[in-house]
Amino acid sequence: MCPLWLLTLLLALSQALPFEQKGFWDFTLDDGLLMMNDEEASGSDTTSGVPDLDSVTPTFSAMCPFGCHCHLRVVQCSDLGLKTVPKEISPDTTLLDLQNNDISELRKDDFKGLQHLYALVLVNNKISKIHEKAFSPLRKLQKLYISKNHLVEIPPNLPSSLVELRIHDNRIRKVPKGVFSGLRNMNCIEMGGNPLENSGFEPGAFDGLKLNYLRISEAKLTGIPKDLPETLNELHLDHNKIQAIELEDLLRYSKLYRLGLGHNQIRMIENGSLSFLPTLRELHLDNNKLSRVPAGLPDLKLLQVVYLHSNNITKVGINDFCPMGFGVKRAYYNGISLFNNPVPYWEVQPATFRCVTDRLAIQFGNYKK
């Protein structure tokens, strides 16, 4: 049975889900974490990435920092009021949880000998200073969660093995060119909740990255950044101050299948802007200041979900969502939200939603002046 402390850890870390929408239980069982010998499972010489927890015999290392809990290769030292990274951490540790402490600095040798570490959780500390070689021993680190700290810059010399970086809710104002140099494996960055403006991104700041997912929400952006990785599948820029989408703003991002622009101040989307997104499946434009349905939606053959609620839309035309003729759209809508708009829904023609899978997928009404 899973110990209570481990269950609490898993539940706590599953609050901020990455783009794959995986809970922390999946994350903990990822390749390289709670590994078991396949000999115990199938008799072969290879290892399994997802062990059968009922058949795993708990192993406790003789090295466990005072006050921490150590189980398998997980070291949990959260909520202890720690001022520094503890010593005596077993070198075979794959997950080190140090969240909710008072750590203010990461020193050169804090992670010395932890060459097998796969995930490092430093969320909700007071970290403002990181030695340039602090992460050097972490040659297998893939997940670094360092959100809710006092950082004013992206940490230098991040491990080249890094796949996922969560650095939201810090004090970062600038992303300089070269800060992500050498991070060829990185595919997910969460950096919302920082006071970033458009001018804070130096040209070439994301050069070399092949990201699938990027979130820069709750920042100070006034427009869509034009120099983000063109490999992006998901881009979330919600809760900013974006006022318009101009023709070439999305030109670079033709591989997007999910775009989040909710809770901005968007009044205008230039005609043709959305035509650069042929693979788009989900579009969030809720809580803006749009007065009409954006042009170009019928041409997005794979679009399935559109959030347009809480805008100023007063009219919905018969061809605003669906292309004329049958067989043109490759995927039908399964979600269109239009509630909290001043549109008289009783005047909308039924044929407007001829390419929607079910009438329950359409949300109208609840407008308040």
From Swiss-Prot:
SS bonds (residue pairs): C64-C70, C68-C77, C322-C355
UniProt-listed InterPro entries: Leu-rich_rpt, Leu-rich_rpt_typical-subtyp, LRR_dom_sf, LRRNT, SLRP, SLRP_I_decor/aspor/byglycan
Propeptide: 17-37
Gene Ontology terms: biological process: articular cartilage development; blood vessel remodeling; bone development
The organism of origin for this protein: Mus musculus
Function of the molecule: May be involved in collagen fiber assembly.
LRR repeats: 83-103, 104-127, 128-151, 152-172, 173-196, 197-221, 222-242, 243-266, 267-290, 291-313, 314-343, 344-369
Keywords of this entry: Disulfide bond, Extracellular matrix, Glycoprotein, Leucine-rich repeat, Proteoglycan, Repeat, Secreted, Signal
Superkingdom of this protein's organism: Eukaryota
UniProt protein name: Biglycan
